[in-house]
C-alpha cells in the first residue's frame, strides 16, 4: 500500500472512530452531523466525501465493524473454551468484556436494530444472523445435534444475551455481576432444555420405528 493510500485509510479510520466517540447513552447515530464528525476527525467537511458517500454509509460501516468485532471476540472465547474453560461462563464473560470496552459499538447495534432506517435495520439483522450462524455451527459440532435444533438454540441464546447486554449498559459493577450470573443461569437452562428436547424427539422416533 502506497503512502497516499495509507493516509487515506488513516483518515477513514479517524472518521469511524470520531463517530463512535460521539455516541453515548443520550446521543444516537441519527443525531450526528457530517460537520461534527469531520471536525472531531480533524478534517474539513468537504474531505468527508473522499471516504464515504454520506453519513449513512459511514453508519453502515460502523454497524459492520461492530458486528465483526463481536464475532471475533466470541471466536477467541471459543479458543479459550477449547483449552478447558466453561463454555457458557467464558462466553458470557467475553460478551460483557465487549460491552465494557466498546459500549458505543453495542449501543449502535441495539438502537439501529429497531431504528427508522430500513438499511440500518437490515445491516444489524445481517450481523446478528452471522452471530447466530457461527454459534449454531459451534453447537452442532460440540453437541452433535441436527442443524434445526442448534439454530433454534443459538437464536434463543443470542436474543437473551442481547437483552441482557442492553441492561448492562446502565448498571454499576455489582448489578452487572448479578446480571452476568442470571444470564449464565438462563443460558444453561436453554442448553439443558435443547438437549432434553432433542433426546425426547430421538426416543419418540425410536419408538415409532420399533
UniProtKB/Swiss-Prot annotation:
Main localization of the protein described in the UniProt heading: cytoplasm
Q: Could you tell me which species this protein originates from?
A: Yersinia enterocolitica serotype O:8 / biotype 1B (strain NCTC 13174 / 8081)
Q: Name one GO cellular component term.
A: cytoplasm
Q: Which UniProt keywords apply?
A: Cytoplasm, DNA-binding, Fatty acid biosynthesis, Fatty acid metabolism, Lipid biosynthesis, Lipid metabolism, Repressor, Transcription, Transcription regulation
Which PANTHER family would you find in this protein's record?
A: HTH-TYPE TRANSCRIPTIONAL REPRESSOR FABR
**Boundaries of every HTH tetR-type domain copy:** 10-70
Listed under subunit, the entry gives: Homodimer.
Q: What protein am I looking at?
A: HTH-type transcriptional repressor FabR
Q: Per its UniProt record, what NCBIfam families does this chain match?
A: PRK11202.1
Amino acid at each position: 500500500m502506497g503512502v497516499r493510500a495509507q493516509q487515506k485509510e488513516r483518515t477513514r479510520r479517524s472518521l469511524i472512530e470520531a463517530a463512535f466517540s460521539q455516541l453515548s447513552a443520550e446521543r444516537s447515530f441519527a443525531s450526528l452531523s457530517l460537520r461534527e464528525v469531520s471536525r472531531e476527525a480533524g478534517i474539513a467537511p468537504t474531505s468527508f466525501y473522499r471516504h464515504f458517500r454520506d453519513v449513512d454509509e459511514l453508519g453502515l460501516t460502523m454497524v459492520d465493524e461492530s458486528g465483526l468485532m463481536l464475532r471475533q471476540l466470541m471466536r477467541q472465547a471459543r479458543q479459550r473454551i477449547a483449552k478447558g474453560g466453561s463454555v457458557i461462563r467464558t462466553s458470557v464473560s467475553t460478551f460483557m468484556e465487549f460491552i465494557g470496552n466498546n459500549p458505543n459499538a453495542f449501543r449502535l447495534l441495539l438502537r439501529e436494530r429497531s431504528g427508522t432506517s430500513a438499511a440500518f435495520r437490515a445491516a444489524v439483522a445481517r450481523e446478528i444472523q452471522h452471530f447466530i450462524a457461527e454459534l449454531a455451527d459451534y453447537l452442532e459440532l460440540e453437541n452433535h445435534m441436527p442443524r434445526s435444533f442448534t439454530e433454534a438454540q443459538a437464536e434463543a441464546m443470542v436474543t437473551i444475551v442481547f437483552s441482557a447486554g442492553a441492561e448492562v449498559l446502565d448498571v454499576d459493577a455489582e448489578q452487572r455481576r448479578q446480571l452476568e450470573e442470571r444470564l449464565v443461569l438462563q443460558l444453561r437452562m436453554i442448553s439443558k432444555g435443547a438437549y432434553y428436547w432433542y433426546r425426547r424427539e430421538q426416543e419418540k422416533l425410536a419408538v415409532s420405528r420399533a
